[in-house]
Design a protein with these regions (language model features):
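N-terminal subdomain of nucleotide-sugar transferases
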Residues: 1-49
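Structural motif
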Residues: 17, 87-88, 233-234, 276, ...
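Active-site donor-nucleotide binding/catalytic segment of nucleotide-sugar enzymes
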Residues: 21-25, 229-260, 265, 274, ...
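Active-site and donor-binding regions of nucleotide-sugar-utilizing enzymes
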Residues: 26-30, 48-146, 335
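A donor-sugar binding/catalytic signature common to diverse glycosyltransferases
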Residues: 88-100, 313-359
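Leloir-type glycosyltransferase catalytic cores
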Residues: 140-184, 357-408
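A nucleotide-sugar donor-handling region in carbohydrate enzymes
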Residues: 146-245
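Catalytic donor nucleotide-activated moiety binding site of glycosyltransferases and closely related
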Residues: 267-313
Length: 408
């Protein structure tokens, strides 16, 4: 059987004229553009705000500033693609308003549509898929597909450790939002996918730092207790960023708050009496929202659960994955990390990895009593496929390894 061709190879081989829309904050799209040009490709870029310009300056040839309204972007993009014979559109994330319009235009004009995203297999990878990522992924969702592809997968060596943690990301974010905030007059009609207010972020980043220090010793002590096996059996609930597209678009809950309340209700009324529950706050959400008041309400209403429900912030998730008996998530990629540890996973949102053989297919109330494990053979095939096809070693906020052929 033929060896799987990595998506990065297909991206390079299948097109000549590329259009880059919004990339991740930072210099990655500039680096990607330069890499494509070494293969004599034509690369065009559209910037949407001054934060985009900060990392992909308009001085780079064939870079354009879109200063129109959102409802005019469809017409602008259709003409742009026709004028420049675009045969591939590349973006970061497929749920931003401009990118959703671009997907429709691409489909109508038979232009390939490529999406970068944070890694499915973290922390040392980023994702590249054709057609969409996460719930918009075009990949089949059944075990037989991945099992049938296993023989075609390349042998993948250990990745370089390129993820550098929070500080590089914070530095890049400050530069991006400072430029975007103070130069809004240039792009008066731009609609950001999140709040675009520098004062808002400064306040909440400071709050995040204070909370990190406040919870440090408490979380450290709790982590040691878990690592020593002193907490007993527990299920893990990793919360997601409150305004992430995975929450806003790829699930039916109104909010993370509503998701959490449903889990707490079910745990209290249906979980075995010996089971504990650990709710883990998302580290990127620390300064923005706090769910302590929700959890406290349930503990007050049901005093018997005060010592069975725990809310943590910065306990390293690998510690929790090594000891936990199950995970409940909306659709977080931490669910894939749990599967790597052979931890049963229930997804309550829409996730591309939610299918029989990998995740639990029953309901929430019955999951507390689940004794089954993910099928190791299925997960191994799933992981090998993505490493051979969709995952690229690197971090958007430090370095991404771009090479051709990729699997060498």
């Amino acid at each position: 059987m033929d060896v799987l061709k990595h998506n990065l190879d297909e991206l390079l081989e299948s097109s000549t004229n590329y259009l880059l829309l919004q990339g991740p904050i930072g210099p990655f799209f500039t680096e990607l553009s330069a890499w494509l040009k070494t293969f004599h490709k034509q690369v065009f870029k559209i910037n949407f705000n001054s934060g985009d310009e900060a990392f992909y300056p308009n001085s780079i040839p064939q870079t354009f500033a879109y200063q129109g309204q959102l409802d005019q972007f469809d017409q602008y993009l259709r003409f742009f693609c026709h004028q420049h014979s675009i045969d591939a559109i590349i973006c970061f994330g497929d749920t931003r308003a401009y990118h959703r319009i671009a997907k429709i235009v691409a489909d109508k004009q038979k232009i390939s549509f490529w999406v970068f995203e944070e890694g499915y297999l973290r922390p040392e990878y980023v994702t590249l898929e054709k057609g969409g990522v996460n719930d918009y992924s075009q990949l089949p969702r059944h075990a037989n597909f991945f099992l049938s592809q296993a023989a075609c997968c390349s042998e993948i060596s250990a990745p370089e450790k390129l993820a550098k943690g929070f500080i590089p990301l914070a530095t890049i974010a400050i530069k991006y939002y400072t430029k975007a905030y103070f130069n809004q007059d240039k792009y008066p009609d731009y609609q950001h996918h999140r709040i675009l207010d520098l004062k808002y972020y400064i306040k909440l980043w400071l709050t995040s730092g204070i909370k990190r220090a406040y919870y440090y010793w408490q979380d450290r002590s709790f982590g040691k207790k878990v690592a020593a096996g002193k907490l007993g059996d527990f299920f893990l609930v990793p919360l997601q960023v409150y305004d992430d597209s995975q929450v806003r678009i790829h699930c039916d809950y109104e909010s993370v708050d509503a998701f959490l309340k449903e889990i707490l209700e079910s745990f209290i009324h249906h979980a075995p009496s010996a089971l504990n529950l650990i709710i883990k706050h998302h580290p990127m959400d620390r300064g923005f929202v706090d769910y302590g008041h929700v959890i406290k309400q349930y503990k007050t209403q049901y005093p018997a659960f005060k010592k069975r429900i725990f809310y943590v912030h910065d306990v390293p998730i690998p510690i929790l994955l090594r000891k936990g008996k199950g995970m409940i998530t909306l659709n977080s990629t931490s669910g894939i990390s749990a599967l790597l540890h052979r931890m049963p996973v229930l997804t309550l949102g829409r996730a591309s990895y939610n299918f029989e053989g990998l995740t639990y297919q029953g309901n929430l109330h019955s999951f507390w009593h689940n004794k089954g494990l993910p099928e190791a053979k299925v997960f191994d095939a799933y992981r090998k496929y993505h490493l051979s096809k969709t995952q690229i070693n690197g971090s958007f906020y430090s370095k991404v390894i771009l090479r051709y052929p990729y699997n060498q």
